[in-house]
């Protein structure tokens, strides 16, 4: 957003034209003032695109939360942004669209953010070719590495260290697998309920998932889960709440 604001703006215009949309908003959290300023400067002549600075909070980037924050329209249970007349795309997609149209280059590389238990000088953004194995990227893995594809909240553990960079690989979180808290029984504290942005009962849905009670999980609203990970993060017993919910969610889709 700081390096290529003009290209991103052109990419947004191309997507608007393809979707037949007359207005677009680029939402930026308030902890990224330089990005917001760069984009605003690039959009001076584009009156149909604006930059909206939003309060930094998690999970602000979820499409349902983002649409409500920007437009005030609330997306109902089981619905998509299109149901309220909105389409949500990320900045990387806008840049890739510009690149494809302006230069003819398909999506053969992308920016990947690397962070976690690695040397502080190696925690940065890399341009990686699609298909590059994780363990061949220019950073040093810890002795017992665990690679999370994505961030620490919503990311998924890579099955193999040589798994490839894909078009949706926005970042990698490198962890030391030797550091792992002991999982304890649920104490019914309600922390996960308070943390859930969708108003669900994660402790209950995860129990249904663990016991393979798919119908009960569906009735409890598992399909509305954003998979933001706030439940697992808030759990004092270190229960893998989100993992169980993901299993139930996948089974209920069948």
Regions found by a protein language model. Give the residues of each.
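Short glycine/threonine-rich loop-to-helix capping motif typified by GTGT followed
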Residues: 32-41, 158-165, 236
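Short, solvent-exposed helix-helix connector turns and helix-capping sites enriched
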Residues: 3-4, 32, 212-213
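Hydrophobic alpha-helical positions that pack around
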Residues: 21-134, 139-142, 151-152
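Active-site gating/interface segments in enzymes
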Residues: 59-60, 66-71, 142-188
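Histidine-anchored nucleotide/phosphate-binding helix
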Residues: 2-18
